[in-house]
């Protein structure tokens, strides 16, 4: 490929990324302005960052949000990967896409409320079982808290993980791991050494998506989180007050 074509391609890609990221760069720029957003003059300061890192409530909420992301990641990524593999091998692709993407078409408040009612009724059921059997193992499993918030995040993020990995899987041919199996490789080795290197970018992109969506999520998590605050909920409450 001619050098000028390669230079033109990377130049265009860099320009597109710059245009997409320009609002983020501008926000970072004004975050160091002592006079705040929209001011006529610019005075450099770290004041706003000092305020953020000295806010114990905000830092605590940041920790809870990171915990939610770290718990959700190792659950939703394998589910998304297996769903994408099922889509790749199945002849009923339309139904798989319909089922996996259906949470995206349900408004956040309706989906969050439905999950809230579901967990409340499920908790009542296990409480009833506990009272009549004396087995209290599952009594508090579905109280509002970390577990309910994580389940809500899994329902919300799984469609995105599925789509990202599915698009990446379009690049490789399923005959390759099958050939490795025929040559004596185990299923895990065929996946890890042949399939995963080709879809690695999609898996890592899906991980980044999950973390970003966890920080961005407000409505569903607010209904399901129970007694702790997330980063977004604290930010919104501080802005409203």
Give the label of every model feature segment.
Residues 22-24, 69, 73-85, 109, ...:
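Hydrophobic positions within alpha-helical transmembrane segments of bacterial inner-membrane proteins
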Residues 2-3, 36, 49-57, 215-241:
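Interhelical loop and adjacent transmembrane-helix boundary motif
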Residues 21-25, 29-32, 78-82, 148-151, ...:
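Membrane-embedded alpha-helices of multi-pass transport/permease systems
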Residues 11, 28, 58-62, 66, ...:
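Hydrophobic alpha-helical elements at and bordering transmembrane segments
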Residues 1, 5-6, 70-101, 113, ...:
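Transmembrane-helix boundary motif in ABC transporter permease subunits
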Residues 5, 32-72, 240-241:
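Periplasmic/extracellular loop-to-transmembrane helix junction in inner-membrane transport proteins
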Residues 46, 109-155, 188, 221, ...:
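Membrane-interfacial helix termini and adjacent extracytoplasmic/periplasmic loops
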Residues 11-21, 102, 155, 161-166, ...:
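Transmembrane alpha-helices
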